[in-house]
Amino acid sequence: MENGTYFIISSNFWTIAGSFGLNTNLLETNLINLGVVLGLLVYFGKGVLSNLLNNRKLTILNTIQDAEERYKEATDKLNQARTRLQQAKQKADDIRINGLSQMEKEKQDLINAADEDSKRLEDSKNATIRFEKQRAIEQVRQQVSRLALERALETLKSRLNSELHLRMIDYHIGLLRAMESTIE
């Protein structure tokens, strides 16, 4: 039975629903009712719509203002970063230039030190050569003197007799007396 009631309701419903539709004839529609409804919508909806639009406008303006502030901050940070980068580049260039000049100075100092060491070694070598030359000359002189004395002694021994020996002694005694008298 219940199925039958549903069927009856359902068939009535479908007959009523079939009568709904869109009437496109403007003359048959109730323009006054529509005007009143639209007027009420505009009158009461104007405040709500105005508030919604104002809120949306304020939200958009705040978003734009925030975006502009973030853009300004980002631009400032970018400029600061560029300035720091430029300073870092300048400092790196200064360090590089100072390093190159320091390297040239060290190189020149090493060259000068090597030249001085070379000159000292040359002077030392020359002094050693002069010393060895003087020593060799002195040794030759001593040997020549020794040999000359040996020959002179041999010659004197071979030629010296007692008479010549006495004359030489007298001669040297006379020389010593002459020296003694000049001293006094």
UniProtKB/Swiss-Prot annotation:
<keyword id="KW-0375">Hydrogen ion transport</keyword>
<dbReference type="Pfam" id="PF00430">
    <property type="entry name" value="ATP-synt_B"/>
</dbReference>
<comment type="function">
    <text>F(1)F(0) ATP synthase produces ATP from ADP in the presence of a proton or sodium gradient. F-type ATPases consist of two structural domains, F(1) containing the extramembraneous catalytic core and F(0) containing the membrane proton channel, linked together by a central stalk and a peripheral stalk. During catalysis, ATP synthesis in the catalytic domain of F(1) is coupled via a rotary mechanism of the central stalk subunits to proton translocation.</text>
</comment>
<protein>
    <recommendedName>
        <fullName>ATP synthase subunit b, chloroplastic</fullName>
    </recommendedName>
</protein>
<keyword id="KW-0793">Thylakoid</keyword>
<keyword id="KW-0547">Nucleotide-binding</keyword>
<dbReference type="GO" id="GO:0045259">
    <property type="term" value="C:proton-transporting ATP synthase complex"/>
</dbReference>
<keyword id="KW-0472">Membrane</keyword>
<keyword id="KW-0813">Transport</keyword>
<keyword id="KW-0934">Plastid</keyword>
<dbReference type="GO" id="GO:0005524">
    <property type="term" value="F:ATP binding"/>
</dbReference>
<dbReference type="InterPro" id="IPR002146">
    <property type="entry name" value="ATP_synth_b/b'su_bac/chlpt"/>
</dbReference>
<keyword id="KW-0138">CF(0)</keyword>
<dbReference type="GO" id="GO:0046933">
    <property type="term" value="F:proton-transporting ATP synthase activity, rotational mechanism"/>
</dbReference>
<keyword id="KW-0066">ATP synthesis</keyword>
<keyword id="KW-0067">ATP-binding</keyword>
<comment type="function">
    <text>Component of the F(0) channel, it forms part of the peripheral stalk, linking F(1) to F(0).</text>
</comment>
<comment type="similarity">
    <text>Belongs to the ATPase B chain family.</text>
</comment>
<feature type="transmembrane region" description="Helical">
    <location>
        <begin position="5"/>
        <end position="27"/>
    </location>
</feature>
<keyword id="KW-1133">Transmembrane helix</keyword>
<keyword id="KW-0150">Chloroplast</keyword>
<keyword id="KW-0812">Transmembrane</keyword>
<dbReference type="GO" id="GO:0009535">
    <property type="term" value="C:chloroplast thylakoid membrane"/>
</dbReference>
<keyword id="KW-0406">Ion transport</keyword>
<comment type="subunit">
    <text>F-type ATPases have 2 components, F(1) - the catalytic core - and F(0) - the membrane proton channel. F(1) has five subunits: alpha(3), beta(3), gamma(1), delta(1), epsilon(1). F(0) has four main subunits: a(1), b(1), b'(1) and c(10-14). The alpha and beta chains form an alternating ring which encloses part of the gamma chain. F(1) is attached to F(0) by a central stalk formed by the gamma and epsilon chains, while a peripheral stalk is formed by the delta, b and b' chains.</text>
</comment>
